[in-house]
């Protein structure tokens, strides 16, 4: 999918979303979660305290990240660990964000999204002027959709089922087999921590 398709997909999934929610989406797609991480204990504690929306599903973002619902079945410690490991600065994040903003402006100016072009441009100008700070979901979005997720890098997706199995069963002895460059070392490193 391209940026236009990702934005349309967000609008289809959340038809009552506001411009602010799309800005959050493209921000997360570009920067990931680097702005949210402080330390492991704080991240884990926040996950444990957050209400869980049982209807959440994995959402692919327009970049290297996914929104993993808290209801997925991972322990708070595993999710916190994946979240922190995903919080590395993204290369060219600002440029990626600005490319996505141009696509968004085109969609709005072509009346493909239900936002005022003038108002959107004013909001985007102010956002840029402020240095593109991270956004929260709108109150409308929070009330209607109850978002409950953490961003993680999509390189961890192939291992999520295994992590869930380990988290929801007894400790396991695991043998990792596979072809060259299939992710054995990455998985072993993740499991060791």
Regions found by a protein language model. Give the residues of each.
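Long, basic/Gly/Ser/Thr-rich N-terminal segments
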Residues: 1-140
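N-terminal pre-Walker A segment at the start of P-loop NTPase domains
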Residues: 144-169
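Short hydrophobic/aromatic beta-strand immediately N-terminal to the Walker A/P-loop
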Residues: 173-175
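P-loop (Walker A) phosphate-binding loop of NTP-binding proteins
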Residues: 179
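Conserved lysine of the Walker
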Residues: 184
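Hydrophobic positions on the alpha1 helix immediately C-terminal to the Walker A/P-loop
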Residues: 187
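Post-Walker A helix-loop "phosphate-sensing" segment adjacent to the P-loop in P-loop NTPases
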Residues: 192-193
